[in-house]
């Protein structure tokens, strides 16, 4: 059995713009670990949210779809990101890092943020583009 414990940062940046809100994603493979007696692949992702619109917006909710080639799709929903509900003025950027464990060495994530325009209180969804979670061995 091969154990991968070398942290690998993927330099491919995925970007998407919805209503002037630019989402950029970088992923990192952090190695393998055992949890509850099972082998898991540890991935982290860094997301930058850039407000290129002329409006102030607040990120209120997140919706994730996590695809693992050995398991069913997992849906994660909740308030804000990493315990925060950031407000972004025009030209502001908010960045954070989070992660997930997969049962396999290949997966993907996608989703959306729910934002509220702070001027007119309209809600809208900002797409998070699909990004791959891949171990380095699969890239060879």
Predicted regions and their residues:
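Low-complexity, acidic Ser/Thr/Pro/Gly-rich terminal tails and inter-domain linkers that flank the onset
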Residues: 12-40
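Short, solvent-exposed beta-strand/turn "edge" segments of beta-rich domains on protein surfaces
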Residues: 31-41, 54-55, 87-89, 102-104
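Short, solvent-exposed loop/turn segments enriched in Ser/Thr/Gly
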Residues: 41-46, 110
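Asparagine-centered strand-capping/turn motif at beta-strand->loop junctions
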Residues: 49-53
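Short acidic, flexible loop segments centered on an aromatic residue
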Residues: 55-74
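Intrinsically disordered, low-complexity Pro/Gly/Ser/Thr-rich segments with frequent PxxP/GP/PP motifs
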Residues: 74-106
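Terminal connector regions
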Residues: 101-140
């Amino acid at each position: 059995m091969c154990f991968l414990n070398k942290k690998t940062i993927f330099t491919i940046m995925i970007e998407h713009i919805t209503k002037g809100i630019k989402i950029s994603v970088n992923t990192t493979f952090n190695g393998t670990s055992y949890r509850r007696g099972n082998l898991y692949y540890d991935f982290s992702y860094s997301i930058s949210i850039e407000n290129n619109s002329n409006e102030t917006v607040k990120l209120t909710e997140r919706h994730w779809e996590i695809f693992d080639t050995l398991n069913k799709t997992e849906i994660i929903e909740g308030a804000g990101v990493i315990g925060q509900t950031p407000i972004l003025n025009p030209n502001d950027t908010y960045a954070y890092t989070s992660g997930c464990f997969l049962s396999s060495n290949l997966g993907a994530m996608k989703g959306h943020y729910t934002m509220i325009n702070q001027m007119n209180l309209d809600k809208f969804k900002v797409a998070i583009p699909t990004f791959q979670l891949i171990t380095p061995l699969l890239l060879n």
